[in-house]
Swiss-Prot record:
Gene Ontology BP, a term: photosynthesis, light reaction
Name this protein carries in UniProt: NAD(P)H-quinone oxidoreductase subunit 1, chloroplastic
Family statement drawn from the similarity comment of this UniProt entry: Belongs to the complex I subunit 1 family.
Membrane-protein topology: Multi-pass membrane protein
Gene name, Swiss-Prot/TrEMBL: ndhA
Enzyme Commission number(s) from the entry: 7.1.1.-
Record keywords: Chloroplast, Membrane, NAD, NADP, Plastid, Plastoquinone, Quinone, Thylakoid, Translocase, Transmembrane, Transmembrane helix
Top-level class of the enzyme under EC nomenclature: translocase
Subunit structure: NDH is composed of at least 16 different subunits, 5 of which are encoded in the nucleus.
Localisation: Plastid, Chloroplast thylakoid membrane
Residue intervals passing through the bilayer: 28-48, 99-119, 128-148, 249-269, 270-290, 301-321, 341-361
Lineage of source species: Eukaryota, Viridiplantae, Streptophyta, Embryophyta, Tracheophyta
Length: 361
């Protein structure tokens, strides 16, 4: 029979307790960046909704939201709270599982894209060597959720909206991917951090906007189509399909689609900033003061986030203004634009970029 000393038993218990606490603290430290990113994304979406309402009101010469909070800034929060308390209705002959899973797939696939977006040199959740292609691969899952929602609703308008969403995504995903390939060739990397660093070598004129102007225009149009924004909102055209794949939804599930559209718009704007506008780099030599960054890591972090978001919201303004400027395309015009114009242009741009890169070796 083995007899243990009391002191040894206490030491073993304290050691096991210490190891358990280390595991708990380790899990907490892993969750902190994720929760911070989710909180930032939520605030970003609320700001986008408020901006769209204010800009739309200004363009239409009317008064925007003004009662929910100062200047109506809490209007999006009020709308979300209202949707939370709405009843969740299910179509009588629809597929309940597909009907429920569809909105979740749309939101989760877009949320995963934020993990590879750098807000600064070290401000990124996961600096992967295939960062831009992870975004393309994950974002291409969202139309599957929309198609599931349309099919599970057992409604002709919903099903047509889901089919349109899938066709539109396939048509514009290819030019988008070819534009990203051109940027990766210029930067010699698929990492989003490396792409931003490659643009910082020559300051403002080193942005890929100037080195890839054709690719920038194609990327801009394709990203608007991927976000299903006007003039590319064919999957939910009110005059034709009531509300498209959202027709049978209510309550929180309808709110998930609402959130997914703005999440997609924000992530597309962030990738325009990262791929073409130099990311977190200010890139203006006369305004760059190195002493500011020597004052501390916190100040440097704030400056990087501010620069990234300023460029992002500039593109968001263009997207919102486009909504009230251009009319909606027909379905045949949308597909012709993607397959007959943007695809050959983006392919030619990729071949030219490859040729120049080979000649410069």
């Amino acid at each position: 029979m083995i007899i243990y000393n009391t002191t040894e038993l206490q030491a073993i218990h304290s050691f096991s307790r210490l190891e358990f606490l280390k595991e708990v603290y380790g899990s907490i430290w892993v969750l902190i960046p994720i929760l911070t990113l989710v909180l930032g994304i939520t605030l970003g979406v609320l700001v986008i909704v408020w901006l769209e309402r204010e800009i739309s009101a200004g363009i239409q010469q009317r008064i925007g939201p003004e009662y929910a909070g100062p200047l109506g800034i809490l209007q999006a929060l009020a709308d979300g709270t209202k949707l939370l308390f709405k009843e969740n209705l299910f179509p009588s002959r629809g597929d309940t599982r597909l009907f429920t899973i569809g909105p979740s797939i749309a939101v989760i696939s877009i949320l995963l894209s934020y993990s590879v977006i750098p807000f600064g040199y070290r401000l990124i959740l996961g600096d992967l060597s295939i960062g831009v292609f992870l975004w393309i691969a994950v974002s291409s899952l969202a139309p599957i959720g929309l198609l599931m929602s349309g099919y599970g609703s057992n409604n002709k308008y919903s099903f047509l909206g889901g089919l349109r969403a899938a066709a539109q995504s396939i048509s514009y995903e290819i030019p988008l991917t070819l534009c990203v390939l051109s940027i990766s060739l210029l930067s010699n990397s698929f990492s989003t951090v490396d792409i931003v660093e490659a643009q910082s070598k020559y300051g403002f004129w080193g942005w890929n906007l100037w080195r890839q102007p054709i690719g920038f225009i194609v990327f801009l149009i394709s990203s608007l189509a991927e976000c299903e924004r006007l003039p590319f909102d064919l999957p939910e055209a009110e005059e034709e399909l009531v509300a498209g794949y959202q027709t049978e939804y209510s309550g929180i599930k309808f709110g998930l689609f609402y959130v997914a559209s703005y999440l997609n718009l924000l992530v597309s704007s962030l990738f325009v900033t990262v791929l073409y506008l130099g990311g977190w780099n200010l890139s203006i030599p006369y305004l760059f003061v190195p002493e500011l960054f020597e004052r501390g890591k916190v100040f440097e972090t704030i400056i990087c986030i501010f620069i990234t978001l300023a460029k992002t919201y500039l593109f968001l303004f263009i997207s919102i203004a486009t909504r009230w400027t251009l009319p909606r395309l027909r379905m045949d015009q949308l597909l012709n634009l993607g397959w007959k114009f943007l695809l050959p242009i983006s392919l030619g741009n990729l071949l030219l970029t490859t040729s120049f890169q080979l000649l410069s070796l």
